[in-house]
Amino acid sequence: MLIAICVQDEISAIVLDPGFSTTRAGFAGEDTPKSVIPTYYGKYTYEAQEKLIFGDDIFVTPRPGLSIHNPMGRDGVVEDWDMAEKVWEYSFTSRLTGPKAGNPFQNGLNDVANGELPSEMEGVETEEKPLADSPLLMTECGWNPTKAREKTVEIAMEKWGTPAFYLARNGVLAAFAAGKASALVVDVGASNISVTPVHDGMILKRGVQHSPLGGDYISSQLRALFKTNSPQPITITPHYLVASKTAVDAGQPAQAKYKTFPPDKAPDASYRTLMEERTLSEFKECVVQVWPGPNKLSATGPNGVSNEEVAKSSPGRPFEFPDGYNQVFGIDRYRVVESLFDAKAAIPDPESVFPAPTQAQTVPELIKAALNGVDVDVRPHLLANVVVTGASSLLYGFTDRLNQELMQSYPGPRVRISASGNTAERKFGSWVGGSILASLGTFHQMWISKKEYDEHGPNIVEKRCK
């Protein structure tokens, strides 16, 4: 009996944090997710059969006709449930639980020569479910609709067979990760920016704001910049299309040998777009910088000199593209992100999938709208606990600029920003919060058990996971 109790305590819950760009999964109580995979998946046809590829394998080989898809919508709500389920399942079976054994009648213990089952095994399921031993905590955005929440608990209980389940809001978990029960959480992800007021561990729904100006929007601004770049427009050639290259001086045309694929062997255009996105991510990490303030980039600084002049005089940053073309980027590296704070600064691009941003979609305005949606008495407390999270918030200078904007808008109350200096914690804020929450002894009473789910149906998630 004692052994059974010890073993039971060893079972760790799994925390699953699905995003638009990546899906994070790991064991509760650990400080980073063991599994971080792209939420994108690949589809191609081989010998007249449709094949699917998940995880980092989508980057490896440009297979003929390989097309890239994403089951999530840009608003953070699932659009394709069948594929979302497969991607999520891959995230934990590939690194955490391992695929479960198939048919229990052919596992060496219960082999039946003629396929006849012993009568006492008639009702046994033919396949063990992937989460039969692990409770599951999943995250969701603050505006996830009821239908989507119910579908999530349904998949976890019925398809994966989890014994206990909980669905937690991203904003609340990011606040917990920063050690706060009340906070104003600014989450800058790949597909959107959200501002979530959290009070005593609950989100204040009327104050939740979000806009589509996330990391992918910044990538689209980079594409617009490269089209109008001088001395020459820049074409991004992904690594898989470069056979060899020769070093060239900055600003000189690339000297590279390119790979070509015959039409029947070439991957779909969506594969190239995904690979270009990897170069753009590298560019954002190495070059792009947020104008630190005070005031907008287009305004005049406190000393009477225009901010653009100051930006031009600061040293540039070099970057080399996969085909060997390289250039030093000056003021342009500030311009591509300025529209997160000033919509008028957006670089126009008629071909972009993103419409021109409005001022209401910028970070300072989202924060203003979020604070206006909550009780006046709570506002100073939220401003003293601003938590910044999300991978795109790692842009150089982002928190400095946010601090300047908030001090200008709210000179009275004390403004304090908490942004983890640890890259992993900032990228995986809501996962870390989920890991902390699911490993607390007092959290046991919060789980929705399989028994409760069977009694009340998927609607229980609305009552229990507020």
From Swiss-Prot:
GO annotation, biological process: chromatin remodeling; DNA repair; regulation of transcription by RNA polymerase II
Record's subcellular location: Nucleus
SUPFAM superfamilies: Actin-like ATPase domain
Organism name: Aspergillus fumigatus (strain ATCC MYA-4609 / CBS 101355 / FGSC A1100 / Af293) (Neosartorya fumigata)
Record-linked Pfam families: Actin
Signal peptide: none
Protein function: Chromatin interaction component of the NuA4 histone acetyltransferase complex which is involved in transcriptional activation of selected genes principally by acetylation of nucleosomal histone H4 and H2A. The NuA4 complex is also involved in DNA repair. Is required for NuA4 complex integrity. Component of the SWR1 complex which mediates the ATP-dependent exchange of histone H2A for the H2A variant HZT1 leading to transcriptional regulation of selected genes by chromatin remodeling. Component of the INO80 complex which remodels chromatin by shifting nucleosomes and is involved in DNA repair.
Subunit structure: Component of the NuA4 histone acetyltransferase complex, of the INO80 chromatin remodeling complex, and of the SWR1 chromatin remodeling complex.
Keyword Signal: no
GO molecular function, one term: chromatin binding
Family: Belongs to the actin family. ARP4 subfamily.
InterPro entries in UniProt: Actin, Actin_CS, ATPase_NBD
Highest taxon of source: Eukaryota
Keywords: Activator, Chromatin regulator, DNA damage, DNA repair, Nucleus, Transcription, Transcription regulation
Annotated disulfide bonds: none
Gene Ontology cellular-component annotations: NuA4 histone acetyltransferase complex; SWI/SNF complex
Name this polypeptide is given: Actin-related protein 4
Membrane keyword on record: no
